[in-house]
Amino acid sequence: MKPATTSWADEVNADYVDGLPPSKEIIDGDYKHITQYKFNDEGKKIKVVRSFKVERKIVSRAVAKRRTWTKFGDSRQDMPGPNSYTTKVADDILMNYIGSKDFEHAHDHLDGNKPMAKCRICNGDHWSVKCPYKGTSMDIESKAIAAATAAAVGDTNKSGKYVPPFLKDGAKGRERDDSCAVRISNLSESMTEDDLEELVKKIGPFTKMYLAREKTSGLCKGFAYVHFKYRKDAAEAVEVLNGHGYDHLILSVEWSKPQN
């Protein structure tokens, strides 16, 4: 469908209440043509024709619902979509400009003559794998000192001294706590993090969540994990959401099983 052409003289001579003809919108395939009339700074009537290419993409339900809100203020008579005269789409970007002196002061700690590598065997300015003393008595002595240090750390539990959490129980460290985590499965491919947050935030506060996605397409794999702050909220999520209908699918919610 091609945009309908009208006589400019007819449009100018037409009698309108506000002095301006109404806006027109014509859709031609994947393109949308919008014709608007306004007065310029000199008080002359001008005609503005804008063409848009219509693209379809999947957005979260919160964004789709927000687009159906009734416009107000200066945009109450605008058509769907943002108006550049009343709407600012971009985010504010704060920039901090620094002078040449500040830039030099920020890079004073970078010494070009300082070696980037340090050998753990002889403390030289080279990597340990390229040390000329590798395999000699000096190398064996450094390994013995490292083993003695590790043994001393292991004995701190008996002496009552503080041990960092990452050194407790050997190299195993602390295991992940899944006592308040639930697994939500049978999710649709269009599920997003915003939709998942909208689904669980009414039950109770949560510390983190994970939505499994395909690496290539970025679509949801069909399951997600939510770690609640309190176990009672996790139990309520299992009771309320299990068997709950969401996006034309029946959700399956269960306790997260600990990793072996």
Curated annotation (Swiss-Prot):
This is Eukaryotic translation initiation factor 3 subunit G-2. Residues 180-258 form the RRM domain. Gene3D superfamilies: 3.30.70.330. The keyword Cytoplasm applies. One of its GO terms (biological process) is formation of cytoplasmic translation initiation complex. It is found in: Cytoplasm. One of its GO terms (cellular component) is eukaryotic 43S preinitiation complex. Component of the eukaryotic translation initiation factor 3 (eIF-3) complex. The eIF-3 complex interacts with pix. RNA-binding component of the eukaryotic translation initiation factor 3 (eIF-3) complex, which is involved in protein synthesis of a specialized repertoire of mRNAs and, together with other initiation factors, stimulates binding of mRNA and methionyl-tRNAi to the 40S ribosome. The eIF-3 complex specifically targets and initiates translation of a subset of mRNAs involved in cell proliferation. This subunit can bind 18S rRNA. Belongs to the eIF-3 subunit G family. One of its GO terms (molecular function) is RNA binding. It holds the Pfam family eIF3g. Keywords: Cytoplasm, Initiation factor, Protein biosynthesis, RNA-binding. It comes from Drosophila grimshawi (Hawaiian fruit fly). HAMAP family: eIF3g.
